[in-house]
Amino acid sequence: MILAFSPAFIRQYRALAETDQQFCNAALEALPTAFGHPHRHAGLGLRALRRGVYECRASQGLRIGFTRHADKLLLQVVGNHDAIRTWLRNSL
């Protein structure tokens, strides 16, 4: 799987505290190899929200929302649970 970053994701990522960026980096390193392999993504908290729309957990309060397009995972949003809910409601 290839990771692609939306402009909104990059903007939100840059606004994170350095420790949150480190948690996010760790999750993003594990995501491509773990996606589609249930036993590998146990620590990521990866789950489907809708068809082709997913979220994973970077830390207890930080989540990453993304969509799947063939062999590419497009990272759309990073933030707390409310940010993911807002993204789902407004963008999809």
Locations of regions flagged by a protein language model:
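A short, surface-exposed loop/turn module that caps and links secondary-structure elements
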Residues: 30-57
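Enriched for short, Lys/Arg-rich terminal
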Residues: 2, 14-15, 21, 54-92
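Non-catalytic, surface-exposed connector residues within folded enzymatic/regulatory domains
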Residues: 3, 22-25, 39-43, 78
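Short glycine-enriched loop/turn motifs at secondary-structure junctions
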Residues: 8, 48-49, 69-70
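Preference for short coil/turn "hinge" residues that link or interrupt alpha-helices
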Residues: 9, 37-42, 71, 77
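Arg/Lys-rich, positively charged N-terminal/basic patches that mediate binding to nucleic acids
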Residues: 1-29
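Residues that form generic nucleotide/phosphate-binding pockets
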Residues: 12, 27-30, 34, 87, ...
